Amino acid sequence: GNGKIIQELEGIFRGAGWNVIKVIWGSYWDQLLAKDKTGLLIKRMGEAVDGEYQAFKAKGGKYVRDNFFGKYPELLDLVSQMTDKDIWKLNRGGHDPHKVYAAYYSAMQNKGTPTVILAKTIKGYGMGKSGESINTTHQQKKLGEEDLLYYRDRFDVPLTNKQVSNIEYYKPSENSPEIKYLKECRIKLGGNLPERSSFAKVIKTPAIDIFDKMKESTGDKEMSTTMILVRMLTNLLRDKNVAPRLVPIIPDEARTFGMEGFFQKIGIYAHEGQKYEPVDSEQLSSYREDIKGQVLEEGITEAGAMSSWIAAGTSYSNHDISMIPIYLFYSMFGFQRTGDFAWAAGDNQTRGFLIGATAGRTTLAGEGLQHADGHSHIMSSVIPNCKSYDPTFGYELATIFRDGLYRMYEKQENIFYYITTMNENYPHPAMPKDKSVEDGILKGMYLYKEFNNYKKTKIQLLGSGTILREMLKAAEILQNEYKIDSSVWSVTSFSELRKEAIEVERYNL
């Protein structure tokens, strides 16, 4: 109430290079402005703050005369021939069709810069004493008959008293200019009803051999699952069906994730191309921006990156083109910062992968708790169509990722995946031959290893992500120091297990 929001917004937009058009005063002010030779009227308009302007429209013409014009005797003289009703009719620009159209026309003539129209309006316009310009407007659930009659008379709606009492809608005749205009506009927009397509052209799931390398043992070589994911994406670029659809999205840390190789392979999207020689141009993986680039490097804006991910993930519905957006971010900076966007993605039936890279609490401690994520899966679990996984080994990651491609782009299910990948380097075993392992990985849990030396007490140890490796160490300690057997379970998704438990519980009600 103390400020003037239109002026504040004008400064912001002008500072950003926009063309600004302000629609503040309606046509009924024109004569007064023409008669004012002292400049006091414009001065008074500039002095009054938004809180005062709200009161002027809530309290009637006499109040406006006394408190707006009454500040200066010259202004009282200016309106001395006007009744309180005349003063009450002095309108705001945002409710004057002539002024609004003039602003729109002016905006259409502007070239080279975007235009914003800032229009001054009245909260609860047309509601009369039941809500116009008063703070209870937002709590008003319905209008009484007296208020409806006032609304009808004010806007000259051609309804009888009985029709108003029955709360009937007014619809112009089919031959009226209004209906003709609306139908013409609707034809230009493609039809009477918006249409949402749930299916687009199928993207066939890549051949299994693309993922086979990820399912092999790394021997003594230590790797992080983040590194394995990047290798897997590099392999996917060789698939002619999938490669053009991949949209890697990075908010900031491409080199931290080991993704700099993508700069040369598929380029960073830039609508103007690259106008400079990058400082690392002599390196093999130098920075390359391109009009046809596929990588979206968003700068440090998780909200912007998430918006790009949603846009690409809903393109199957909006544009009949399935894209495969893969947004990689520090897992601590995902759902904790942009959880509302993730929920919106569920509402929009977005398809794609969210990768919470460098997850876990076993590394990155040098950067403080800001990177020690151990709870993002709790936040992702509340979104019904988000499938969350926390794999430990490369074969688990490959199995989950391929299943995601199959379910989202071949079966075209309305789900999306959140997968956390680690920063810790360690050896990765080969995928067990047991066929139940793949099913267990996808369902959320499978038996990884059993210790059966003593045939007595047996403890069940469960772990996911890097913590599974600590479970294996714990099993060794239990066996060697306490002579206790154990079963070690790899829990790839506590979230999926919970969903299954809820489903079973509901079924058994």
Name what the model sees in each region.
Residues 2-302, 307-311, 455-467, 473, ...:
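Conserved acidic/glycine
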Residues 1-7, 11-12, 21, 255-256, ...:
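Conserved thiamine diphosphate
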